[in-house]
């Protein structure tokens, strides 16, 4: 349905890492722009992805515009994917690649999403706004890669899941147990 509203030759930014998107039949009037976290066959891909204490760094390889070193002040590979999607949309609509990368490097998290606070030798990552299964999985994956000696996590409720609530919370518990946490703590009404 999104494609139906796009004019002839419009860029359509798609995740190359999603096998279902790659297999989808796209209308001839759109121009797909593929991004990937690993596959250099995509139009734009991220290489040498590293999680650092204050964000992510990676090499952005754009088949049209060249190669750039990028650092974003956001944690997790999912945010690298978000940055690639934003880069693809902006550059294919005519923005200067260097300006887009500068904008990405100045990105600020909103609300209570992956806010990093350093105090007295302890790093706290607050990521509690509107928790849902995907955001919690991304937070645990990011947390697992974070450079530190011991990891503690306080995990709260994921609301508004209806009949899927128990199953989603149990899955989150399994992921937390497998994530290398020193001490997972959970608070839920279940």
Where are these regions (language model features)?
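Short beta-strands and strand-loop turn motifs
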Residues: 15, 126, 152-157
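Glycine-rich phosphate/diphosphate-binding loops that line cofactor/substrate pockets in enzymes
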Residues: 143-151
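Amphipathic alpha-helical transducer elements in NTP-driven molecular machines
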Residues: 80-83, 133-137
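Charged helix-capping and loop-helix junction motifs
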Residues: 137-140, 165-175
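Glycine-rich phosphate/pyrophosphate-binding beta-alpha loops
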Residues: 112, 129-136
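Short, small-residue-enriched loops and turns at beta-alpha junctions
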Residues: 131-132, 159-163
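Acidic, Mg2+-coordinating active-site environments of NTP-dependent enzymes
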Residues: 1-123, 148-149, 174-177, 181-183
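Conserved small/polar residues in nucleotide/adenosyl-binding loops
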Residues: 188-189
């Amino acid at each position: 349905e999104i494609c139906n509203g796009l004019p002839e030759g419009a860029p359509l930014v798609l995740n190359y890492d999603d096998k279902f998107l790659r297999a989808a039949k796209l209308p001839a009037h759109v121009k797909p722009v593929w991004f990937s976290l690993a596959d250099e066959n995509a139009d734009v891909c991220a290489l040498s992805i590293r999680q650092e204490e204050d964000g992510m760094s990676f090499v952005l390889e754009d088949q049209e515009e060249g190669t750039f070193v990028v650092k974003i002040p956001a944690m997790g590979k999912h945010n690298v994917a978000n940055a690639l999607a934003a880069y693809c949309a902006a550059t294919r609509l005519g923005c200067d690649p260097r300006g887009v990368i500068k904008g990405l490097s100045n990105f600020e998290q909103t609300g209570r999403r992956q806010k990093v606070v350093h105090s007295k030798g302890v790093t706290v990552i607050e990521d509690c706004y509107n928790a849902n299964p995907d955001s919690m999985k991304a937070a645990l994956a990011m947390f697992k890669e974070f450079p530190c000696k011991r990891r503690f996590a306080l995990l709260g409720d994921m609301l508004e899941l209806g009949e899927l609530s128990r199953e989603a919370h149990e899955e989150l518990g399994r992921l937390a147990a497998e994530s290398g946490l020193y001490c997972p703590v959970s608070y839920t009404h279940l």
